[in-house]
Every structure is written in C-alpha cells, then in structure tokens.
Amino acid sequence: MENYSINLPSYSIGDNVYEKIEKICSPYGSKAVVIGGHKAINSAKELLISATKDTKVSIIDFVWYGGESCFENVDELAENESVKKADYLFAVGGGKALDTTKCLAVKINKPVFTFPTIASNCSPVTCVSIMYTKEGVFKQPFFFEKPPKHAFINTSLLCKSPSKYLWAGMGDTYAKYFESSVSSRGEDTLVHYHRLGVVISQMCLEPILKYGKKALEDNKNKVNSYEFEQTVLSIAITTGIASILLTAEHIIDYNTGLAHGIFYGLTSFPHIEENHIHGEVVGFGVLILLLVDKQYD
C-alpha cells in the first residue's frame, strides 16, 4: 500500500477574476505585499488597487523582485520590512518573478498567491521554482510540497501583453507532451501519478494545435477570445498540473528531457538569456528531441 499526498492547483480564470481576491485571500490575513517585475507591476497595479479597495485585503507595498530568479534575491527580499509585515505575498509578473516569490514564500513560511501578467509558462501553479545564478545561468530546480494558494489568471490583462510571450509559452507547453511521452516510453509500471501526468500531457499539445494560431492572432490584436483563453489554460494550468504529477517525487525524470536540457545548457551563454525567451529555446529543443527520437514527420 502506497502512502503519499498530491497537492493540485487552485485557480480562477476570466476577465474579472481580481474581484475574487477578498473572498479567496482574506482567510489568510489582511496585509499583502506585491512582488514582481517593474513592467508587470505597472500593468497590474491599478487593477489590484481597484480590486482591493474597501475590502478586507490591504496592499501595503509594491516591491521589485530583483530582476533574476536567484537565491540572493530571495534572501534580500526576506529582509524587506514590507515583506516581514505582510500576511501573504502577491507574486506578479512572468516566470522568474513568480518563481522568486514562490521560493521566498517557502523560505519565510508565508502564503503566496500568483498573478501572471504574461502567458509564457506554468509557474503560476507549480510546486517548483527554477533558480539561476545572479548572472542568469541555470542553477537548479527548487521543489516544495504545495503550489501557490491560488492563481488569478486575468485574461483581459494577459491579452494585452506582447504576443511573443504567448508564442514562447506554446513552445514550453507542447514540450511537456513530447518530453514526458519519450521519457516514459516502455515503462509499464509507472505509479498512478506519473501515468496520470503523462496522460494529461496530451492536453499540452492538442489545444495548442487546435487554438494556438487563432490565439496568437487575437493576442496581437489584443482580443480576449475563447481561443486565447483555451491556449492560456494549456500553458498555465494543464502544463502545471502535469508538472506537479510528473515531479511528485521531486525528480525530473518524466517532467523534462532533451528540450529543456538544451535550454538550461544554453543559459551559460549570456546572449541566449538576454535575447531569447525560455519557451522559445525549449521549442527549438523539441525539434532536436524529435530528430534524436527519429520522429521526422
């Protein structure tokens, strides 16, 4: 008999999900500190202030995450007075800002809620932070037991973000299908959560093929369409759930593979980190993976 626990994500998606902040966050306290990138905070600040006005949730400060997902920035944030005073953390931005804040939340034992401002990865709901050196070279995955308390996925905000992030996010998403299916091939004794993760990863590919082209066009035109929402769900939620299941033992054997390995290796070259988005390089890595696996079609 196996004994284990799996903690799956909680999330809201739509064009007015910030209205749910008080109901979802207030049981954890009243004081929130927002941590994120400069651009992300600027894009979400007024929405967050408006959504928490005259509620039981008070935003006490907006704090820059430091510019890189690294332990040095986590340690510095832990000493920030507003962070110390807050009951919980609002992580706002892209993957690195969210991963930094998630790691911080574990370090200081405070709840964290995520507010993605771009749809480029599954960081809003995963139980891992990808950590780099201060110079941007991949260092390690930092695993923890539970995902953020809740992810607020505001599609009206996301559809106004640069389309290059959605484009890259699709590459990061379908990589989950190819990497997990290749990594698990031939293994007939996968435990339930690994097998479930592999099956769910199929939804990391199918919606991208079905809705991705239209979603990208709509994102370029800042249209919050059904196709855009379905693509965002695949990028942020489906991939995140698959990731949690595939790394339940905090081992990346089934969750990642050659495509991500290529990206992590290339981060040692400064121009890669400076000029290319994570999912963009991972998408290229998928092509290499398919060639190595002799999937030429």
Question: Where are each of the predicted segments found?
Answer:
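Structural motif
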Residues: 31-33, 87-90, 111-113, 149-151, ...
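ATP/NTP phosphate-donor binding region
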Residues: 1-87
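Solvent-exposed alpha-helices and their adjacent loops that cap or buttress functional pockets
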Residues: 3-5, 26-27, 82-84, 105, ...
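A glycine/threonine-rich phosphate-anchoring loop and its flanking beta-alpha core
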Residues: 9, 108-201
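A short, small-residue-rich loop immediately preceding and capping a beta-strand
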Residues: 81-104, 108-119
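Short glycine/serine/threonine-rich phosphate/pyrophosphate-binding segments
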Residues: 18, 41-45, 96-103, 122-125
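Active-site segments that bind and position negatively charged phosphate/pyrophosphate groups
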Residues: 191-297
